[in-house]
């Protein structure tokens, strides 16, 4: 699939929604990704730029063309999720090679992210599909997926607040997506049918988006 949107954040939001995460889950995940990498798929952990002598661009290029051979074991966080542990970086690199994509390709990284969540972090993925608040989703990602050294209350608050900004922008109808060259504002409608709460994306024109799934929780 090709990513839809005018910016990395919009492309990431649309992609994750298309994979069945609910708006709270997407926002909570994106808040963490933003604090990790600024949503940049070529982001090299800042503290390692001087240590390794690379910028984001030169590191990515050197890994892609094979000039730099220590990507897996250099302990540097990389990409939108700042993958750091050697086995996860190894799997990321293998996935990129299988796809014939740059290690810094956004779509490839998003697909790999979903693969990780679907296989090794199923409990986190379940929260992202059923969360009832941004903070619930954000903490699930922080504590069980990203697992940074500092997981304290201040970090939890910061990441949840960052995620809330994405929720307010895209899930409340304040955001937009580009379709056939035109920006169309979207939002979410909620209804209770037979005791089941249903969310669905909508156009401001009132037409439903057929390619986005219903979310039940």
Task: Give the label of every model feature segment.
Residues 54, 140, 144, 205-206:
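Segments enriched in small hydrophobic residues
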Residues 1-4, 181-183, 216:
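Short, intrinsically disordered N-terminal pre-domain segments
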Residues 193-217:
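N-terminal low-complexity segments that are often proline-rich with Ser/Thr-Pro
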Residues 2-7, 11, 37-129:
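Peptidoglycan-targeting cell-wall enzymes and recognition modules
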Residues 1-39:
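Export/targeting segments at the very N-terminus of extracytoplasmic proteins
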Residues 25-29, 79, 109, 137:
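Residue-level detector of well-ordered alpha-helical segments, enriched
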Residues 89-188, 192-193:
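Non-catalytic cell-wall polysaccharide-engagement segments
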Residues 31-36, 84-86, 144-145:
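Active-site-proximal beta-strand/loop segments in catalytic clefts of secreted hydrolases
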């Amino acid at each position: 699939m090709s990513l839809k949107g005018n910016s990395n954040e919009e492309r990431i939001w649309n992609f994750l929604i298309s994979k069945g995460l609910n708006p709270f889950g997407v926002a909570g995940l994106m808040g963490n990704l933003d604090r990790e990498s600024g949503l940049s798929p070529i982001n090299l952990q800042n503290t390692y730029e001087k240590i390794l002598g690379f910028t984001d661009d030169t590191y990515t290029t050197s890994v892609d063309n094979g000039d730099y051979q220590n990507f897996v074991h250099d302990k540097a966080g990389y990409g939108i999720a700042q993958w750091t542990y050697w086995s996860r970086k190894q799997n990321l690199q293998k996935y990129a090679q299988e796809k014939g994509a740059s290690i810094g390709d956004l779509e490839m990284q998003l697909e790999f992210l979903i693969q990780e969540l679907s296989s090794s972090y199923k409990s986190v993925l379940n929260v992202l599909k059923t969360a009832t608040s941004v903070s619930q989703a954000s903490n699930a990602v922080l504590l069980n997926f990203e697992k940074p050294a500092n997981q304290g209350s201040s970090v939890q608050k910061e990441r949840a607040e960052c995620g809330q900004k994405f929720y307010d922008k895209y899930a409340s109808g304040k955001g937009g997506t580009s379709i056939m060259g035109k920006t169309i504002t979207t939002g979410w409608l909620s209804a209770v049918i037979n005791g089941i709460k249903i969310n669905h994306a909508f156009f401001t024109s009132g037409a439903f988006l057929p390619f986005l799934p219903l979310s039940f929780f």
